[in-house]
Amino acid sequence: MITRMQIRIQRTHPQAILPTYAHGPAEDAGMDLHAVEDVTLEPGVARLVSTGLTLEVPPGFEAQVRPRSGLALKHAITIPNAPGTIDPGYRGEVRVIMLNLGRDAYTVHAGDRIAQMIVTRYEAVEWLEGSLADSTRGAGGFGSSGR
């Protein structure tokens, strides 16, 4: 079952486009974020791309910013800090760090879909310091499960 929540949003740029579900929330978990400016990404260079939006994420939730698979596959464009987190207390503009891993320059145009945003619940953690329970895996990591 899909529940709906309301989140306050403000456009800080006249060309800003509200985040949208391409196929509706029953089929898409992520909403598309759009650029409000033209930005050329040179190979090997990361740039901040503006969305012209500010959010008021409710306490107990975060908004995660993730790459779009089509940009990654077709143009080798990614988001190096993915998933980027928009915390409940942040009120600045949502901007996306975009990195061109390809060989050719890529230009993002105003209105282009540049990332996906997912709003998800998180839990506050209280640490219980002490020894840990045994497990089958133990301290094995970094390829310990085989090829």
UniProtKB/Swiss-Prot annotation:
Residues the record lists as binding substrate: R68, S69, G70, N81, T85, I86, D87
Domain of life of the native organism: Bacteria
PANTHER family: DEOXYURIDINE 5'-TRIPHOSPHATE NUCLEOTIDOHYDROLASE
Enzyme class per UniProt: hydrolase
Paired cysteines (S-S): none
One term of GO molecular function: magnesium ion binding
Protein name: Deoxyuridine 5'-triphosphate nucleotidohydrolase
This protein's pathway: Pyrimidine metabolism; dUMP biosynthesis; dUMP from dCTP (dUTP route): step 2/2
InterPro entries found in the cross-reference section: dUTPase, dUTPase-like, dUTPase-like_sf, dUTPase_trimeric
Required cofactor(s): Mg(2+)
Entry EC no(s): 3.6.1.23
Gene3D superfamilies: 2.70.40.10
Family recorded in the similarity comment: Belongs to the dUTPase family.
Gene name tied to this protein: dut
Catalytic activity: dUTP + H2O = dUMP + diphosphate + H(+)
HAMAP family: dUTPase_bact
Alphabetized Pfam families for the sequence: dUTPase (PF00692)
Function: This enzyme is involved in nucleotide metabolism: it produces dUMP, the immediate precursor of thymidine nucleotides and it decreases the intracellular concentration of dUTP so that uracil cannot be incorporated into DNA.
